[in-house]
């Protein structure tokens, strides 16, 4: 059964995803098979509207520095970052901590 998650883009990061903050996403993986690395790649390929904006989100194969990543309201660094196994019902929040002035 595919994994259903919620993805939120905050801190102005929603501009890369058609200015939509909340997304319901179905990952094409079985539960226990998808790591955050696969989820982030899927999100970049399917939610980022303009391919030119992918570097705003991804750098060197991972989420760009300056973007806070929360998995179910917990910093992803405490959950194993890219190695975390995504579960059905997870909420992934990406918040830009860099703002223009």
Curated annotation (Swiss-Prot):
Q: Which domain of life is it from?
A: Eukaryota
Membrane-spanning residues = none
Stored InterPro entries:
Beta-grasp_dom_sf, Mopterin_synth/thiamin_S_b, Urm1
GO terms (BP aspect): cell budding; cellular response to oxidative stress; invasive growth in response to glucose limitation; protein urmylation; tRNA wobble position uridine thiolation
Disulfide links within the chain: none
List the GO molecular function terms.
protein homodimerization activity; protein tag activity; sulfur carrier activity
State the similarity comment: Belongs to the URM1 family.
Q: Output this protein's name.
A: Ubiquitin-related modifier 1
Q: Which gene encodes it?
A: URM1
């Amino acid at each position: 059964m595919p994994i259903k998650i919620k993805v939120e883009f905050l801190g102005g990061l929603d501009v890369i995803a058609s200015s939509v903050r909340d997304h319901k996403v179905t990952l094409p993986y079985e539960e226990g098979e998808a790591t955050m690395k696969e989820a982030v790649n899927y999100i970049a390929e399917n939610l980022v509207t303009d391919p030119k904006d992918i570097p705003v989100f991804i750098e060197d194969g991972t989420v760009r520095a300056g973007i806070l990543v929360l998995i179910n309201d917990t910093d992803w660094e405490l959950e194993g970052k890219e190695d975390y196994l995504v579960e059905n019902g997870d909420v992934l929040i990406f918040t830009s901590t860099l703002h223009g002035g």
